[in-house]
Amino acid sequence: MSRIGKLPIAIPSGVEVKVGTEAVEVKGPKGVLVTPTHTELNYAVEDGHVVITRATETRTARAQHGLRRTLLANCIQGVTKGFSKTLEVIGVGYKVAVKGNLVELAVGFSHPVIMEMPEGVEAKVEGQKLTISGTSKEVVGEIAARIRRVRKPEPYKGKGIKYDNEQIRRKAGKSGGK
């Protein structure tokens, strides 16, 4: 049995979970999230907890058990607390600005790179730090990865866009001797 999949998911107060045939809908103070169900898994809401069990013991059911439980737990956390990722822009002349739902990056190109934030995702700037926050962990992570991809941190001077907790492996430059 999946060590993660067998754990029940606690439903906090103010959160409503509806189990359908195709998807599970989670409503909370921060919004609504929907995650698809799997045909080989059974979903049940019992006394303030969501329990996911396997209908069959096939390889796909075993593989999906822990995954679907984690996805549902992420939905519940997303509609209550939300998720956020912080990016740091490092480099002389590198700037980041938020204008409405657009993030404008000036990171050494001849033009500013403008990225649009999808619905439900918010961006804030404090100095050289950009914080992406929203209800869906998947969307927040994808947007943060796309922004980082614009100018990955380089190993010699460390310039670029990096995650706040990321360690950049630095390299020594040329030795330059004869």
UniProtKB/Swiss-Prot annotation:
Q: Which Gene3D superfamilies is this protein grouped with? A: Ribosomal protein L6, alpha-beta domain (3.90.930.12)
**What Pfam families has UniProt attached to this entry?**
Ribosomal_L6
UniProt keyword annotation of Transmembrane helix present: no
Q: What UniProt keywords apply to this chain's record, in alphabetical order?
A: Ribonucleoprotein, Ribosomal protein, RNA-binding, rRNA-binding
Where does this protein have compositionally biased stretches of type Basic and acidic residues? Answer: 155-169
**Region described as Disordered:** 155-178
One Gene Ontology CC term in the entry: cytosolic large ribosomal subunit
Q: List the disulfide bonds.
A: none
Asked whether the UniProt record includes Ribonucleoprotein among its keywords, one would answer yes
Query: Its domain of life?
Result: Bacteria
A molecular function annotated in GO for this UniProt entry is:
structural constituent of ribosome
Q: Which InterPro entries does the annotation name?
A: Ribosomal_uL6-like (IPR000702), Ribosomal_uL6-like_a/b-dom_sf (IPR036789), Ribosomal_uL6_a/b-dom (IPR020040), Ribosomal_uL6_bac-type (IPR019906), Ribosomal_uL6_CS (IPR002358)
Q: Which GO terms describe its biological process?
A: cytoplasmic translation
User: What does the subunit comment say?
Assistant: Part of the 50S ribosomal subunit.
Question: Which protein family is it in?
Answer: Belongs to the universal ribosomal protein uL6 family.
Role, per record: This protein binds to the 23S rRNA, and is important in its secondary structure. It is located near the subunit interface in the base of the L7/L12 stalk, and near the tRNA binding site of the peptidyltransferase center.
User: In its UniProt entry, what is this protein called?
Assistant: Large ribosomal subunit protein uL6
Which gene codes for it? Answer: rplF
